[in-house]
Amino acid sequence: MQLSWKDIPTVAPANDLLDIVLNRTQRKTPTVIRPGFKITRIRAFYMRKVKYTGEGFVEKFEDILKGFPNINDVHPFHRDLMDTLYEKNHYKISLAAISRAKSLVEQVARDYVRLLKFGQSLFQCKQLKRAALGRMATIVKKLRDPLAYLEQVRQHIGRLPSIDPNTRTLLICGYPNVGKSSFLRCITKSDVDVQPYAFTTKSLYVGHFDYKYLRFQAIDTPGILDRPTEEMNNIEMQSIYAIAHLRSCVLYFMDLSEQCGFTIEAQVKLFHSIKPLFANKSVMVVINKTDIIRPEDLDEERAQLLESVKEVPGVEIMTSSCQLEENVMEVRNKACEKLLASRIENKLKSQSRINNVLNKIHVAQPQARDDVKRTPFIPESVKNLKKYDPEDPNRRKLARDIEAENGGAGVFNVNLKDKYLLEDDEWKNDIMPEILDGKNVYDFLDPEIAAKLQALEEEEEKLENEGFYNSDDEEEIYDGFEASEVDDIKEKAAWIRNRQKTMIAEARNRKSLKNKAIMPRSKLTKSFGKMEEHMSTLGHDMSALQDKQNRAARKNRYVERGSDVVFGDQDALTASTENGVKLRQTDRLLDGVADGSMRSKADRMAKMERRERNRHAKQGESDRHNAVSLSKHLFSGKRGVGKTDFR
């Protein structure tokens, strides 16, 4: 059950609510649309605007409706308190207006979205959007008064104290200025304003304290005047509703000195007037300000008026003085005891709860099947068992005794293998590895392992004697193959393995190239020797081809003549060109440069030329691109004050 409403969201005024929702629509939805776009795109653009705006208003209204409490679902005390403070009908009408506006906005959004689906042009869709947003704005503007009222209620309801109607409560009531707030300050840490004039307390104040490890709350109520309920104001009605609805111990305070401004007769009359509200409650009358006058000092007439209060059944009278802090804690403790006793009594009176518990309890008892008495059986060995006597020299030694004989704790080391059950007691302390040669020893343990090993060795010896492992034909190495065939197979297998290795190496070389250039097969140099070796491996006879190559070489052989000596350079150049040998290429960067100093000067000049291009971010001498002079992200936009982004 909710006891406080401090987390209700702020209720914005009507104009502010309009600005919030419309600005969010402008920021969260697209803003560029042109007549040249497809009509489906234009319709979707404006339908999105209408839907988003309607959802924004509906969301704000739902937050308001969910934040405020439903006055029909709260405790009767809170319901009557809210009725007194905020006028229940006014509160309901305001929330109903918000709920009605929510449904109207939803209806407007649906109707205009349906119309926008048949819009024929941008202008028509835009006018429909304006009409939809205008109708929503009109609906919201009509909520100016309900929204302002709900904001005031939110601010006030958030400051109300958290009062639990069902917990242990001490309720302090009485005429104004009789010492109620002073008593609350004495028994709790509540900082209540105390003044020497009436009606200082205008609302309910709550303080908490502990008694017997239980949490109690004490409520200070505003002063009550003796007049009909219809004539009471909101301040007095808060006290009346607290007395009527809260399960508490009522402390009715009286001032016999009459410094509060009311006579003893009026105070007694008020007690009898509100006596019907004390039904099923513990009541105590507290005579306060005994430092000024005590009950014994009253005259006979006033004493009789005070005695009339005792005639009410269950009412006790106690005295206290908040000024001197006399009997304050005794009054508090007595009230707490009465409250606890009454709560326990009320629980016992509610038979339904007791019956619910009794219905869940069932005590089952076994039924006798015959008249035979079955006494417990105790073996004779147990009966004859002697009680352990530490002084008996023939007693059975315990592990504790053995430890004491061998030096005590910290000196004696317990042998954990002493209780092993083995064939030979000498095996108990043998070292047995758990892991041997990387294997778990326990996986190979077998009680008959020696016998199995001997049987296996005998079987192997028998097979060797029978010649099971000997070959029938020493010349026949493999079934169905002669020795020559086996050699041929091995040779071919070796060639296949070498070929596979070569293919793998070539594939790896191709992968390792990645983005590097690969030399085409047609450009690779091929020698006759490599071709001859390759063809020989394939089983071809290359002798005839070798003779033909030798004859062609002798025919084209060059013989030096006398003229070659004179024109040697030119002929050598011609011969080398004819044979297909490439000329050595020269570095053209060095052409036209006389020496190293000229070369360094040329480098410096080239560097200076590149500096200007780099400053303008040019790609080279041929780059003629002109960049924009104004940055779009800095200079584009509809307004110049920096409030709106470019559209």
Swiss-Prot record:
Bias category Basic and acidic residues: which stretches?
Answer: 598-626
Taxonomy, superkingdom:
Eukaryota
Q: Which GO terms describe its cellular component?
A: cytoplasm; nucleolus; preribosome, large subunit precursor
| Domain OBG-type G: from-to ranges | 168-340
The UniProt annotation places GTP binding at: 174-181, 220-224, 288-291
CDD domains recorded: NOG
Does the entry feature the keyword Nucleotide-binding, yes or no? Answer: yes
The molecular function GO annotations come to: GTP binding; GTPase activity; RNA binding
Query: Subcellular location, in the record's words?
Result: Nucleus, Nucleolus
Q: Which UniProt keywords apply?
A: GTP-binding, Nucleotide-binding, Nucleus, Phosphoprotein, Ribosome biogenesis
Q: Which residue stretches belong to region Disordered?
A: 594-647
Q: What does this protein do?
A: Involved in the biogenesis of the 60S ribosomal subunit.
| Assembly | Associated with nucleolar and cytoplasmic pre-60S particles. Directly interacts with RLP24.
Miscellaneous comment text of the record: Present with 28000 molecules/cell in log phase SD medium.
Q: Which family does it belong to?
A: Belongs to the TRAFAC class OBG-HflX-like GTPase superfamily. OBG GTPase family. NOG subfamily.
Q: What is this protein called?
A: Nucleolar GTP-binding protein 1
